[in-house]
Amino acid sequence: MEEFVRQCFNPMIVELAEKTMKEYGEDPKIETNKFAAICTHLEVCFMYSDFHFIDERGESKIVESGDPNALLKHRFEIIEGRDRTMAWTVVNSICNTTGVEKPKFLPDLYDYKENRFIEIGVTRREVHIYYLEKANKIKSEKTHIHIFSFTGEEMATKADYTLDEESRARIKTRLFTIRQEMASRGLWDSFRQSERGEETIEERFEITGTMRRLAEQSLPPNFSSLENFRAYVDGFKPNGCIEGKLSQMSKEVNARIEPFLKTTPRPLRLPDGPPCSQRSKFLLMDALKLSIEDPSHEGEGIPLHDAIKCMKTFFGWKEPNIVKPHEKGINPNYLLAWNQVLAELKDIENEEKIPKTKNMKKTSQLKWALGENMAPEKVDFEDCKDISDLKQYDSDEPEQRSLASWIQSEFNKACELTDSGWIELDEIGEDVAPIEHIASMRRNYFTAEVSHCRATEYIMKGVYINTALLNASCAAMDDFQLIPMISKCRTKEGRRKTNLYGFIIKGRSHLRNDTDVVNFVSMEFSLTDPRLEPHKWEKYCVLEIGDMLLRTAIGQVSRPMFLYVRTNGTSKIKMKWGMEMRRCLLQSLQQVESMVEAESSVKEKDMTKEFFENKSKTWPIGESPKGVEEGSIGKVCRTLLAKSVFNSLYASPQLEGFSAESRKLLLIVQALRDNLEPGTFDLGGLYGAIEECLINDPWVLLNASWFNSFLTHALK
């Protein structure tokens, strides 16, 4: 075939085709059918434009003899055959000069007479099938499509064939000749059968080098090459008897399909061990705020100024002492660090003008807490690759932890309403398209249900902390910058409020890669006595730093105020996602919206108003050992939001794995509930995949225990 291509096509076309294939990492010597197809396509594009000119009046002219009149300009701009960068440059300049909409994919030609891009297709299959594939791929009304086949058929958008009869006949004749030439050499059949559907970029993505070798090594038995295997998979129609299909795939496989009955599934095994501990980047239900209402001080909105103002609202400071040490840390350093923060804030107040930011002195306690000079020295790989026993040092398996009750309490708290509003109506973002009345109505109802929710407070707190930390990490790479943890809200009466939760001190932050870590020390106010659930606070050193007067039903009571201090770390990519936590609002809104849609399709009318305003109706919220929990529509909105927020706050590889694997078991159980008689093979393997994600993460363990409640009730 390669020899035929080189004989049959003009050398310039052959050279262009080779360049195109190399650009995609394909070899013309191996993928000879593709080589032939590219040459054919190039030739058709050139023939399409040959001899067609436009005169000064914009009229189309066909000139076949020698040198055309200098006043004529080519009717078609050829884009196909240029390298990608050049091709896009041409497309962009055409769009800029003519105002034509820019296409998503590179077209083949531009027609100056009709002012449109043209996509040329040459197919060995039915023209209409290929036409639909092309149209489906480019999804643009503006690009004109023209398909030719080797049998002389053609098809074009709106049956507008652009060229005169004779020019098209030339193209069809040439295609017919190519087909006959191939047939006479016994090449046509293989060429005809090798045509795949319209390829998207993903399908063009060729595997080369090491990956290619690995792919070839890991082929199932009985397959000689990756192409062979791909062709088999593409042609695999997944219907009919599964066992038969499996045995047809390989002699090695003998899967017995076991029926999945109510008695089949067992509960997930949760790990034993000490209770799991809190691992969020900031305190959740245990956080305490020092607040100012209607802030109007000088420098309002500058975090450091706001923080100092909030600190001044509290008068119960006392000499700090450690009430719950951190098992592994040097606890006096945490105490010294807090005293240093207080001292340096005092220094600032004595200055004439409060600065916008504060960099902490690099004391020994902060250097220790922030891991300064602790990173192992980096050595160039070149210098040590000759060391014979070079290996990565062993890391310990993570210690297994059992589910503790605090994480369910955290979740319940996140679903509750607070007495402040944390988002304005437009926080979810205006839709770009003109919103239909229904969509904005749904959004307003949803926002009303969640604006006062504690999970929404966590979103705004997370967005603020991550934004401030990422900014400081870039702006003050070498400094130990003091970053107040602040949030803003509105009271029931609509008054603005600024809250201070505590402080963060950031370590050195030369973050080159997304995953490079910046260390920080967090110091957060709380009224929670850590001695009640010491296992929850394993990673913290807790100080008692003051006494707070609280108004209660029986009058004022004094409660000790604690400071939860710990060393922590994050990375650019984690901060980027933290800054985007508002997406949780959108995700849960979409989930609620699909419930409204389901209700509306049953009633055959929009049920938005009834859905949100019928306070008597209850909806399933989740599973607990008691059974299916139900609640109002507001509770549903807040629970879905809290789940989304916790997925963000407690994001981890364990959660990724658990979500993906448990979903498979969930689908099987749902199929059983729908009487679809599901069958499974290697159910033990699926349980193994789920349970290897249950190690020590509190949120994953809680989800696993919910999953067990679901299994129990679903199979009753």
Curated annotation (Swiss-Prot):
The keyword Nuclease applies. GO terms for cellular component: host cell cytoplasm; host cell nucleus. Mn(2+) 1 binds at residues 41, 108, 119-120. Mn(2+) 2 binds at residues 80, 108. GO terms for biological process: cap snatching; DNA-templated transcription; symbiont-mediated suppression of host gene expression; symbiont-mediated suppression of host mRNA transcription via inhibition of RNA polymerase II activity; viral RNA genome replication; viral translational frameshifting. It is found in: Host cytoplasm; Host nucleus. HAMAP family: INFV_PA (MF_04063). Binds 2 manganese ions per subunit. Keywords: Cap snatching, Endonuclease, Eukaryotic host gene expression shutoff by virus, Eukaryotic host transcription shutoff by virus, Host cytoplasm, Host gene expression shutoff by virus, Host nucleus, Host-virus interaction, Hydrolase, Inhibition of host RNA polymerase II by virus, Manganese, Metal-binding, Nuclease, Phosphoprotein. A motif (Nuclear localization signal 1 (NLS1)) lies at residues 124-139. This is Polymerase acidic protein. InterPro entries: INFV_PA, PA/PA-X, PA/PA-X_sf. Its EC number is 3.1.-.-. Belongs to the influenza viruses PA family. Phosphorylated on serines and threonines by host kinases, including human casein kinase II.
